[in-house]
Amino acid sequence: MSSRREGRELALQALYSSDVEVMDGTTVLKRIMENFGDGSEPAVDAHSRSFSFAAELVNGVVANRAAIDQRIEEKSKNWSISRMARVDLNILRLAVFELFYRPDIPKNVTINEAIEVAKKFGADDSPAFINGILDEIASLLPDKE
């Protein structure tokens, strides 16, 4: 698994946990890092590329959450954010952050990665749901090279 994919998965878990436990995303990310694996050692090194990318994503989503949620709400026809599954919503938040705040990542990569994470963590219909909304949102952006 690539370090960015692992970072996206860690970020998703941190954002989901922070929704459930009403806790700071970075604190949750560190706790997840410490508790995964067999318990004998941290599953992810705090200095690893995966953790660094996850921390950037979590901090970016937290800092820009209102703008991100507004973009999701505008393009999710017949779905309010309050009705969305928490996993799906947080995958969308991560992807929208990448689309608008990480111009170095091509939008097709961001969308594909979100779909792959949704296949692993979401419901059966999550990948199609996420793809539909992200395609709508990405259509607002110029192509990234």
From Swiss-Prot:
Keyword Transcription (UniProt): yes
Matches recorded under InterPro entries = NusB-like_sf, NusB_fam, NusB_RsmB_TIM44
Cellular component (GO) terms are: cytosol
Coiled-coil stretches, from where to where?
A: none
One Pfam family of this chain? NusB
One GO BP annotation is: transcription antitermination
Name the domain of life: Bacteria
Against Gene3D superfamilies, the record matches this protein to: NusB-like (1.10.940.10)
Which keywords fit this entry according to its UniProt record?
RNA-binding, Transcription, Transcription antitermination, Transcription regulation
Q: What's this protein's function?
A: Involved in transcription antitermination. Required for transcription of ribosomal RNA (rRNA) genes. Binds specifically to the boxA antiterminator sequence of the ribosomal RNA (rrn) operons.
Q: Which family does it belong to?
A: Belongs to the NusB family.
Question: Which NCBIfam families has this protein been placed in?
Answer: nusB
Q: What is this protein called?
A: Transcription antitermination protein NusB
